[in-house]
């Protein structure tokens, strides 16, 4: 059987918006940023089995860091990017240090509460800094990337680099340990491994990637809004990861592209686009559930 040339297919799909230009190219640029955020959640689930509703704090927080530092001078992106990553890592470590003591629904609710805390602080706590309900506008792009095509291509290259590192990480000794942790945490603990330490590491890496996506979204749109920090944004990122299959390396990217372009297409034809989008998500969830059950009952190979 011939191997499918996935690299060539991905390259062609990635370059297609350049030929279309205009609105499709802007949508593609936005999809790249959301893909990074969705990939951060897919990575967390793939390596630890954890599900978070707090990633909007990292995603939107990265966007706000970029906005606050670059509104006056785009050359400050050299400082905004590492500080946004620092925000993603430190806030994830703080949340993980508290949250990883709990499991299941308790962990999920704690992450949601954290995101809402950051959301309220940005919206009402420091309106003179964050812009309050109005957010912040006039965010420039990095020098040399002012054009949409250049910004999109750079973001696409960054996303592909992230996915390549993600794939390499899974095959590394550390990635194999995390995979074993996801499959049987108690057995790993019984063998003397500090599983909480490894979970915290995965959570920190996930937070950094989400913050990177937020930085890229701020430059793409030119504004940030408190909604970027709300738990609904976490839910949107999670839905993207699930639509893409959540376990494959490309899950977050695929889900982001599908939802961004599907939403844009439906909203262009009907005011009821949310209804049709919801129906699509229900069908996607049912298909995933059926596929999962089929995999459970499939006979194992010799």
Indicate residue ranges for each PLM-predicted region.
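Membrane-interfacial amphipathic/re-entrant helices at transmembrane-helix boundaries
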Residues: 1-36, 65, 73-80, 149, ...
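Helix-loop-helix "hairpin" substructures at the membrane interface of multi-pass membrane proteins
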Residues: 146-225
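Alpha-helical transmembrane segments within multi-pass membrane transporters and channels
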Residues: 73-116, 254-256
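Extracellular/periplasmic helix-loop junction at the C-terminal end of a transmembrane helix
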Residues: 114-145, 175, 270, 291-297
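Generic structural signal for small/hydrophobic residues in well-ordered secondary structure
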Residues: 28, 52, 65, 92, ...
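Single transmembrane alpha-helix segments in multi-pass membrane proteins
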Residues: 17-71, 98-107, 187-189, 245-249, ...
């Amino acid at each position: 059987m011939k191997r499918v040339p996935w690299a060539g297919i991905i390259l062609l799909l990635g370059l297609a918006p350049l030929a279309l230009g205009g609105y499709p190219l802007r949508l593609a640029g936005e999809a790249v940023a959301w893909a990074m955020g969705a990939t951060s959640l897919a990575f967390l689930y793939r390596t630890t089995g954890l599900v978070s509703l707090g990633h909007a704090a990292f995603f939107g927080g990265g966007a706000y860091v970029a906005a606050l530092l670059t509104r006056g001078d785009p050359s400050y992106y050299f400082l905004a990017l590492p500080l946004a990553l620092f925000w993603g890592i430190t806030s994830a470590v703080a949340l993980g240090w508290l949250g990883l003591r709990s499991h299941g629904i308790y962990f999920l609710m704690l992450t949601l509460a954290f995101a809402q805390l950051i959301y309220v602080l940005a919206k009402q706590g420091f309106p003179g800094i964050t812009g309050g309900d109005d957010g912040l506008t006039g965010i420039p792009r990095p020098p040399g990337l002012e054009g949409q095509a250049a910004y999109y291509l750079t973001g696409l290259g960054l996303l592909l680099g992230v996915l390549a590192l993600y794939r390499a990480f899974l095959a590394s000794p550390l990635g194999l340990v995390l995979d074993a942790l996801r499959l049987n945490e108690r057995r790993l603990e019984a063998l003397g491994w500090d599983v909480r330490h490894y979970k915290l590491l995965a959570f920190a890496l996930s937070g950094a990637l989400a913050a990177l996506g937020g930085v890229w979204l701020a430059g793409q749109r030119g504004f940030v809004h408190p909604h970027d920090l709300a738990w609904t944004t976490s839910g949107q990122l999670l839905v993207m990861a699930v639509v893409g299959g959540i376990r494959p390396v490309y899950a977050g990217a695929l889900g982001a592209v599908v939802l961004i372009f599907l939403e844009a297409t439906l909203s262009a034809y009907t005011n009821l686009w949310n209804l049709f989008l919801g129906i699509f998500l229900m069908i996607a969830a049912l298909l995933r559930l059926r596929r999962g059950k089929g995999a459970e009952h499939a006979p194992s190979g010799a």
